């Protein structure tokens, strides 16, 4: 057994904790075989089953002490077996959660008791006891250190010869049985492995490339995006590091489905599975497997994404109905790639012929690898173009065509850049590079004349003198460097290396010319990565110390372009770039240039603007935010915020907006009085500046003091007025977000009501993107806490669009809309509308949502719906399976879900018929299991639920039998008065049963309740007094019975 567990079983990599068994079919098969061996051991080898282990097998169990019956002594949270060794020590000892077992007989009985949990228990035992043979038989029988074969048997025979007694003979028999099990497990593993699916790099690559063709933002696409985590491809077709290729891993891909978070997937020879994703520190992949192994990528995605599965079936139908739609000789209608038409058409026809149904079995024909670099728009560019076409043509995907104009190439470049910025998330250092495949021009392509002209200029840069170099740089600058052909021409002939080398010369003119070109071409995502790979960023960081302001400006602007992805931002920080960029914000004090006032001031402003621009790009990672703060960036940004230069204000506010996501920054922003200037710039005519100011307020308004400052400085009125301009969706999302967060304060809600913002918000509930809807509904949810605002929303017809949004899939939107609907349901008139629109059923269906936040919010919303419905009992019973669903939610691990569900059950149980139904569904034992909690919110609602459930049948007695009374008494020691009131009411109801009274008295309830009789809360007084009265009556009755 030791060798099989060491060599065949698949263990997780040694991280911060102990190794665990991976969740693989092979491991499951091994564990099941071990279970079968142990379960049958007691019957096949009854004498050996009584053998006492040298050391107990010990692990953390999930078994409940109550599961043990005859043959065991159960006392509270401990269990002892009646069967003991010669010293009287029990062979099984459980002290929750630790369990110790010292014989095969007890192991076999434990598995019988575990029932459905036996697999988990066996796995936990194996993980906690990596060398079980040594513990069972002693170190002399340690199979792990022995070689399988005759040497093992001979060693055992030697031991028996030396120790000629019955115990040694039993040990020998057990050792041989374990050796046979070991060999059986090894053979079983080999058979299992031989049946597993084996993928190869070509299969995986073609599947990913074909999926890319059907990816994008359109409704008909199967995925939003799918990208490799690494551009580098080894000669064997793998992209995984060599030390992972040894384990059979081929590559790693980031997949973004339409209806789920981004998935980090490992493609290996054994199959495809989810890994641990990107780590927070260095952005490396956590290679540990998190889930099942699937035969291919399509199968995994069908399991994880309903939209993928649905759209894949549509693609199958589409291609089966129109097999002849795309012919190689079709005339190109739209420009997509910068390359020769004949070359691309030929390649495209090959792709069209090879395009097949991804949902079927593995591809039968694979693309042959090529040594030629090709120039083509990357898969990401194609996705971006497809998304643009979806927006223009109502969601219909247009086919890509063969060539592209310079303007079209620039559009693609900007779109790709925007996607990359979105992926480079602003909230955390764990954002990941969206690395793209490295595309180069094909040698024999018919390229524009500019391509060859630029390559000639690069040759002059390489071999010319200083004068020739400057002339070549000036000539190169005259080309349209925004055109991708020109950018790639510079790179393909080695021009990037030359330009970066020029930055290390002493000639200022050469540096300026080189930086001007690098600044233009670094808008291209591939060029950015090439610059980082060639070590260009450290050189630019050093230039920031130059006394020449023009050089500093160009270097900072180029850094701003390059630092759009995580690796580049990390390089800037590690080479001291953040400190130097912060210094640029204050560069005027250290200037040594001629004091020509207007020119001097203009140059200073430009240097500070470029520095702020670079900091804005760098501030998208947490570590850089901290570096900016420690370098003293906040006071300098605050000072620049007072300037009148709009081109300066945008990057300054943008940097503050990114940084304001961190609590330390929000405190510093308050201290520097930045809110006042943010509010002031809301009145600017520049829409981009308004957007960033609103977004910064949105980030900062989590703090109550900041919300008050926004109101005091007059920021609510411009925010309300900006709601009327709905053309700019990005700005509208920022403004509605700021209004949402500001609405958390009641004083601000009153102001918004004065400015008629609530009516405007109701009007935004339709025909808006989800980013706007989340904020609009969030703001209405806060406003709905007041009666006047609920009336306004109802009169403006806001109930119906709110209820309509309950059918969405966006988690944040569902959380907000359920809160808003629940708040509206407090009004009887609104509740009638919600009921008529089937809103309660929609809320109830959200209890099945996989996201705990959505479940909890939906449950809270149901409470006022049940309270204010005309015939609540009948309404609840009308939902088929609804009561059982609510009761089963009591098995959740999320405290908020549990508290909200308890609140729902409290309202459901007001109807006696419904109370009877949920009692039949087992609500009493489930509530009793939750009693041992320290969460005051859950305690309060749990106590209220128990109080209400006591009013049916023998539920009072059942709560006592399930040991719910003693934990409730401890609730009285809480500091929360609401918990005291609910607990006293529950104890009062429970005290109607004599056994419960005894339990309360034993746990010291009387003294605690006596203190609460003097509470100013009348309900608490009454419940406490009633409970004491019941306990006292029981005591008197016992006393009377004793003397009579």
From Swiss-Prot:
Its main location: cytoplasm. PANTHER family: ARMADILLO REPEAT-CONTAINING PROTEIN 4 ARMC4, OUTER DYNEIN ARM-DOCKING COMPLEX SUBUNIT 2. Component of the outer dynein arm-docking complex (ODA-DC) that mediates outer dynein arms (ODA) binding onto the doublet microtubule. Involved in mediating assembly of both ODAs and their axonemal docking complex onto ciliary microtubules. HEAT repeats lie at residues 448-485, 487-527, 530-568, 627-665, 668-706, 831-870, 874-914, 916-955, 958-996, 999-1037. The lineage of its organism: Eukaryota, Metazoa, Chordata, Craniata, Vertebrata. Keywords: Cell projection, Cytoplasm, Cytoskeleton, Repeat. Residues 317-338, 379-401 have a biased composition (Basic and acidic residues). The keyword Repeat applies. Disulfide bonds: none annotated. The keyword Cell cycle does not apply. It holds the Pfam family Arm. ARM repeats lie at residues 484-523, 525-564, 535-577, 622-661, 663-702, 746-785, 828-867, 871-910, 912-951, 953-992, 1004-1031. It is found in: Cytoplasm, Cytoskeleton, Cilium axoneme; Cytoplasm, Cytoskeleton, Cilium basal body. It comes from the Eukaryota. Transmembrane segments: none annotated. Residues 317-409, 423-446 are annotated as: Disordered. Expressed in trachea multiciliated cells. One of its GO terms (biological process) is cilium movement. Gene3D superfamilies: Leucine-rich Repeat Variant. Component of the outer dynein arm-docking complex along with ODAD1, ODAD3, ODAD4 and CLXN. Interacts with CFAP61. GO terms for cellular component: outer dynein arm docking complex. This is Outer dynein arm-docking complex subunit 2. Signal peptide: none annotated.
């Amino acid at each position: 057994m030791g060798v099989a567990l060491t060599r065949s079983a698949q263990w997780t990599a040694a991280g911060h904790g102990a190794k665990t068994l991976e969740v693989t079919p092979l491991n499951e098969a091994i564990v099941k075989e071990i279970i079968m061996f142990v379960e049958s051991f007691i019957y096949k080898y009854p004498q050996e089953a009584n053998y006492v282990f040298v050391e107990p097998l010990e692990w953390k169990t999930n078994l409940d002490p109550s599961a043990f019956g005859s043959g065991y002594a159960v006392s509270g949270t401990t269990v002892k077996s009646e069967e003991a060794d010669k010293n009287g020590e029990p062979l099984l000892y459980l002290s929750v959660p630790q369990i110790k077992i010292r014989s095969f007989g007890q192991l076999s009985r434990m598995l019988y008791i575990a029932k459905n949990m036996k697999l988990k228990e066996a796995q936990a035992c194996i993980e906690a006891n990596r060398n079980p043979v040594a513990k069972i038989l002693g170190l002399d029988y340690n199979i792990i250190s022995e070689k399988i074969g005759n040497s093992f048997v001979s060693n055992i025979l030697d031991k028996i010869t030396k120790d000629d007694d019955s115990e040694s003979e039993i040990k020998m028999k057990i050792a041989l049985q374990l050796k046979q099990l070991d060999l059986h497990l090894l053979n079983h593993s080999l058979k299992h492995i031989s049946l597993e699916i084996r993928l190869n790099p070509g299969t995986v690559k073609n599947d990913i490339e074909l999926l890319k063709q059907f990816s994008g933002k359109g409704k008909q696409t199967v995925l939003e995006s799918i990208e490799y985590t690494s551009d580098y491809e080894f000669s064997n077709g793998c992209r995984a590091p060599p030390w992972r290729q040894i384990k059979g891993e081929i590559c790693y891909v980031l997949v973004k489905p339409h209806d789920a978070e981004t998935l980090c997937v490992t493609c290996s020879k054994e199959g495809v599975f989810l890994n641990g994703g990107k780590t927070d520190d260095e952005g490396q992949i956590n290679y540990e497997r998190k889930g099942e192994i699937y035969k291919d990528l399509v199968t995994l995605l069908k399991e994880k994404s309903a939209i993928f599965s649905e759209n894949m079936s549509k693609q199958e139908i589409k291609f089966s109905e129109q097999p002849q739609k795309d012919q190689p000789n079709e005339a190109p209608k739209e420009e997509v790639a910068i390359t020769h038409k004949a070359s691309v058409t030929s390649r495209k026809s090959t792709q069209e012929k090879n395009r097949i149904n991804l949902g079927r079995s593995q591809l039968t024909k694979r693309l042959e690898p090529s040594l030629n670099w090709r120039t083509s728009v990357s898969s990401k560019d194609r996705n971006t173009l497809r998304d643009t076409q979806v927006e223009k043509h109502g969601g219909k995907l247009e086919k890509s065509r063969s060539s592209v104009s310079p303007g079209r190439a620039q559009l693609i470049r900007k779109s790709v850049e925007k996607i990359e910025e979105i992926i480079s998330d602003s909230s955390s250092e764990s954002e990941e590079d969206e690395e793209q495949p490295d595309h180069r021009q094909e040698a024999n392509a018919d390229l524009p004349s500019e391509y060859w002209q630029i390559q000639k200029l690069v040759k002059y840069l390489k071999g010319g003198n200083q004068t020739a170099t400057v002339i070549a740089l000036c000539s190169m600058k005259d080309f349209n460097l925004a055109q991708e052909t020109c950018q790639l021409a510079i790179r393909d002939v080695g021009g990037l290396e030359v330009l970066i080398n020029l930055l290390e010369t002493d000639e200022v003119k050469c540096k300026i010319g080189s930086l001007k070109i690098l600044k233009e071409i670094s808008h291209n995502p591939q060029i950015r990565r090439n610059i980082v790979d060639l070590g260009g960023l450290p050189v630019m960081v050093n230039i920031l110390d130059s006394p020449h302001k023009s050089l500093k400006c160009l270097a900072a602007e180029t850094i701003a372009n390059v630092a759009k992805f995580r690796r580049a931002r990390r390089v800037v920080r590690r080479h001291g770039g953040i400190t130097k960029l912060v210094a640029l914000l204050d560069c005027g004090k250290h200037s040594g240039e001629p004091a020509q006032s207007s020119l001097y001031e203009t140059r200073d402003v430009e240097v500070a603007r470029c520095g702020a621009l670079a900091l804005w790009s760098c501030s998208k990672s947490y570590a850089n935010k901290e570096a900016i703060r420690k370098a003293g960036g906040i006071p300098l940004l605050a000072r620049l915020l007072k300037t009148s230069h709009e081109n300066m204000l945008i990057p300054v506010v943008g940097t503050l907006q990114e940084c304001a996501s961190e609590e330390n920054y929000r405190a510093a922003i308050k201290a520097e009085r930045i809110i006042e200037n943010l509010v002031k710039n809301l009145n600017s005519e520049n829409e981009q500046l308004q957007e960033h100011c609103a977004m910064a307020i949105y980030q900062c308004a989590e703090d109550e003091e900041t919300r008050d400052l926004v109101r005091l400085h007059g920021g609510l009125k411009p925010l309300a007025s900006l709601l009327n301009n709905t053309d700019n969706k990005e700005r509208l999302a920022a403004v509605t977000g700021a209004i949402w967060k500001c609405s958390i304060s009641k004083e601000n809600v009153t102001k918004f009501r004065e400015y008629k913002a609530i009516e405007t918000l109701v009007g935004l509930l339709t025909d808006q993107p989800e980013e706007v809807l989340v904020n609009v509904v969030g703001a209405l949810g806060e406003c709905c806490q007041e009666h006047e605002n609920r009336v306004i929303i109802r009169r403006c017809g806001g109930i119906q669009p709110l209820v309509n949004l309950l059918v969405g899939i966006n988690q944040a939107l569902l959380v907000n809309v359920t809160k808003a609907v629940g708040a509206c349901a407090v009004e009887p008139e609104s509740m009638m509308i919600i009921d008529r629109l089937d809103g309660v059923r929609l809320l109830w269906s959200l209890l099945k949502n996989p996201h705990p936040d959505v479940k909890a919010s939906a449950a809270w919303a149901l409470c006022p719906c049940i309270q204010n419905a005309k015939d609540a009992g009948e309404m609840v019973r009308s939902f088929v399976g609804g009561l059982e669903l609510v009761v089963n939610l009591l098995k959740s691990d999320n405290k908020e879900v549990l508290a909200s569900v308890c609140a729902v059950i409290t309202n459901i149980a007001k109807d006696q018929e419904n109370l009877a139904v949920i009692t039949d569904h087992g609500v009493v034992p489930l509530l009793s299991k939750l009693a041992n909690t320290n969460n005051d919110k859950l305690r309060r609602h749990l106590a209220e639920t128990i109080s209400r459930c006591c009013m049916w049948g023998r539920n009072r007695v059942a709560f006592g039998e399930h040991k719910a009374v003693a934990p409730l008494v401890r609730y009285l020691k809480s500091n929360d008065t609401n918990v005291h009131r609910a607990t006293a009411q529950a104890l009062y109801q429970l005290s109607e049963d004599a056994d419960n009274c005894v339990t309360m008295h034993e746990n010291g309830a009387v003294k605690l309740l006596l203190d609460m009789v003097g509470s100013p809360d009348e309900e608490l007084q009454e419940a406490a007094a009633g409970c004491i009265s019941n306990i006292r009556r029981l005591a008197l009755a016992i006393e009377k019975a004793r003397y009579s």
